[in-house]
Amino acid sequence: GLKKAKGNIQTSPEYKDLTNRAQRALNNNYETHPTPYKAANLMGQDANQLYTAYRATGEQRYADKMLACTRALLASTPDPKLINDFYCGDVLFLLTHTYDACYDRLNQEELQKIEDLTFQIAKYHHNVQRKGRVENHIFDNHYWQRAYREMLQIGLMFADKNDTAKEILEYCYELWTARAPASGFNRDGEWHNGQGYFHSNVKTLWYVPSLMSYVTGTDFLQHPFYKNLGKALVYA
């Protein structure tokens, strides 16, 4: 697990790249931007590197940076146009992962502000879900690449204390079992809009089934799509 990994992480061939990426994020000063929300997507992208480094190494400086960025957002006026899927995904990643990594360092007011802002941003995407568009549309690339993953994480994080999160979690689970991976009826491992675009979807494709397998005890990677994926990529 993570505790064991922290003791051996420096021997990993990926350690240098991991810490270099995190260092570049540390060197940025987006939290000092006069209008923090104009740099919020960049903060979120940095948070991806910082959170990974924090969990892998346990070094507090990475969490400190995430916390500074989050507090900058909490102290400013939210962007009323928070609906773009990738922009929202970056902001939600920063908020939820700071909430996770720094929970004990946030006061009750800050925790509540993060929760409120998270659901304020997620509301638009959840309304899209509730209208039935995603399960009936052939395939919304941006939703599956990013918004779905963030919504699933929100559902898991807050389902025990928030009815909307519980609804989101239930929806995401049912949607995955009905329409994923790769639209739900793809069994041959081919990526429907071309293997050259596969890389944009790969994080959702490995993260979600791995997470659901862990939570449910059922191996979601046994789906025929995954069984045939390697061969499909080779012959694409």
Map each language-model feature to its residues.
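N-terminal module-boundary/linker segments of secreted carbohydrate-active enzymes
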Residues: 1-12
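Aromatic-lined, polymer-binding surfaces characteristic
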Residues: 15, 19, 23, 27-236
